[in-house]
A protein has these predicted regions:
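Helix-terminus/linker motif at the lipid-water interface of multi-pass membrane proteins
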Residues: 26-44, 114-131, 187-194, 254-283, ...
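Short runs within selected transmembrane alpha-helices of multi-pass transporters and secretion channels
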Residues: 65, 143-162, 170-178, 199-214, ...
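Small-residue-rich hydrophobic transmembrane alpha-helices
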Residues: 44-104, 151-170, 277-341, 372-394
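Transmembrane helical elements of multi-pass membrane transporters/channels
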Residues: 12-31, 143, 177, 206-210, ...
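Generic alpha-helical transmembrane segments of integral inner-membrane proteins
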Residues: 18, 22, 26, 30, ...
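Short alpha-helical transmembrane segments in multi-pass integral membrane proteins
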Residues: 1-14, 72-147, 191-246, 303-368, ...
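Transmembrane alpha-helix boundary and packing residues in multipass membrane permease domains
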Residues: 17, 21, 33, 70, ...
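Interfacial/gating helices of multi-pass transporter permease domains
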Residues: 35-55, 132-139, 196-197, 238-245, ...
């Protein structure tokens, strides 16, 4: 990505990743469709209530993946074979240790946390009172936790492959995982009647398959680095650099997930149907965000390789061109959601009232995707250059200082006799405001240019 027209390099790298992200979102969507159609809206709300906690469990590995991707791209750009070898080996070791530690620490707290968050105790299936939404959430999260290594290694190994400039292979492996996940969803839920637990098992099995394929690909890319046990022995410089670069990104996701968990407690007060509506719009929102996330990740690799090669002129050109392309995609998707929102919501449920509620909530969020295009693109540039702290602080400001308090303030100010918890739209309005604030802050800090001084030093 250090040669040729910047926009072309970015677009060619982004498109396979965008398809892969859409595929990943597709099998999350299939989870919801299968649950909503074959089990019911209460089961759909169980999956929805679980997602903020599951995202919180994954933030550690998102951080490791970010650190490994930035290091791999910069060392690949500077052709530092030894540094690249230790980066890959140490990333695998750190991931193994992190998986074991997370399972040991998190397992005892799943059910208490769900109770603390006011997770509904309505029955998942009407007439079966002894299996509630809370029980289904606990089952779903427990299975995902004990299979977390599959999700973790796909994130880390896929990130390294992209850092080396190959976004096509990661796409192919994700497509395989998507097909497997869809097949197993239908088999476990519709045929075997395993319920919400069946959805969790399908996801875990598919992720392990994708991780295994990524590992094989990395072993086959040894023309760029050496892959041997000695490189997996922890070396202080590389472990510290992975943590230094990855910790802010992991904390960013942790902060965002924590905000979602806090807001989930407010969401749960509005009842099972509102929770189900939120899971529907989260799935549609996931698709709408894909171009933004894809351009952001592509620009991280692009910036990393060009910073490694000392080409800051290309980094600046790529930032402008990549952001414009991301904004263009977001405009198209916003119009599509506004025009075709109701049919999209109808894919997930046959309940007309739920479709109407989901569309009204989605209508609010649709206007924020352009702002997120700017945030993700410029944050990607800063991360790729080695500045992972600035995006973290922006996330703290937008998620903790703006979004969470604003949601509760709007809820409090709109309380009436008919709406004892205020208007449910408080969740989406606060999120929209935080997105716009994030875009403004990211633009200001990118323009200041301190990210240009953060390149990684070789050992």
């Amino acid at each position: 990505m250090t040669q040729g027209a910047p926009w072309k390099s970015i677009l060619l790298f982004t498109v396979p990743m965008l398809i892969g992200n859409i595929a990943q979102q597709l099998y999350s969507t299939v989870d919801s469709v299968v649950v909503g159609k074959y089990i019911g809206d209460n089961a759909l709300s169980a999956v929805g209530s679980s997602l903020p906690i599951l995202n919180m469990l994954l933030v550690l590995f998102i951080g490791i993946s970010t650190g490994a991707t930035i290091m791999a791209s910069q060392f690949f750009g500077s052709k530092s074979r030894n540094d690249l070898s230790y980066t890959i080996g140490n990333s695998i070791t750190v991931t193994l240790i992190a998986c074991a530690a997370l399972i040991a620490v998190a397992a005892p707290f799943i059910r208490p946390l769900l109770t603390l968050l006011n997770t509904p105790t309505d029955p998942v299936v009407e007439g079966i009172e002894d299996y509630t939404v809370l029980d289904a959430c606990a089952d779903y999260l427990s299975i995902c936790l004990f299979g977390i290594a599959g999700m973790a290694f796909y994130n880390i190994l896929g990130g390294i492959i992209r850092g080396l400039g190959d976004s096509v292979s990661a796409l192919l492996y994700l497509l395989v995982a998507t097909v497997v996940n869809i097949f197993l969803d239908i088999l476990f839920v519709a045929s075997f009647g395993l319920g919400v637990a069946g959805v969790a098992w399908a996801t875990i099995i598919a992720q392990f398959i994708a991780s295994f394929l990524c590992l094989i690909k990395i072993i086959r890319m040894r023309e760029h680095f050496d892959f041997a046990p000695k490189y997996m022995k922890p070396v202080g410089h590389y472990v510290k650099t992975i943590i230094r670069l990855g910790l802010p990104s992991g904390l960013t996701q942790a902060i965002f997930s924590s905000a979602m968990i806090i807001v989930q407690s407010l969401t749960n007060q509005f009842g099972v149907q509102f929770i189900a509506a939120n899971i529907v719009i989260m799935r549609v929102d996931g698709f709408a965000m894909m171009p933004n996330f894809s351009f952001g990740t592509a620009l991280t690799t692009y910036a990393g390789q060009n910073v490694g090669a000392g080409r800051y002129d290309r980094v600046i050109k790529g930032a402008k061109q990549g952001t414009l392309m991301a904004v263009g995609f977001s405009v198209v998707l916003t119009l599509a959601i506004l025009l075709f929102g109701k049919p999209l919501m109808g894919i997930f449920t046959d309940t007309e009232e739920l479709v109407e509620m989901s569309y009204r909530l989605m209508f609010i969020l649709a206007f924020g995707y352009i702002a997120m295009a700017v945030t993700q693109s410029l944050s990607g540039i800063m991360r790729g250059a080695g500045d992972t702290m600035t995006p973290m602080w922006i996330s703290i400001i937008t998620s903790v200082i703006i979004r969470v308090p604003l949601a509760y303030i709007i809820s409090y100010l709109t309380v009436t006799e008919d709406l004892p918890h205020g208007i449910p739209q408080c969740i989406q309005i606060s999120l929209l405001v935080s997105w716009v604030a994030g875009a403004l802050l990211t633009t200001v800090f990118y323009a200041r240019g301190k990210w240009k001084t953060k390149a990684i030093k070789s050992n």
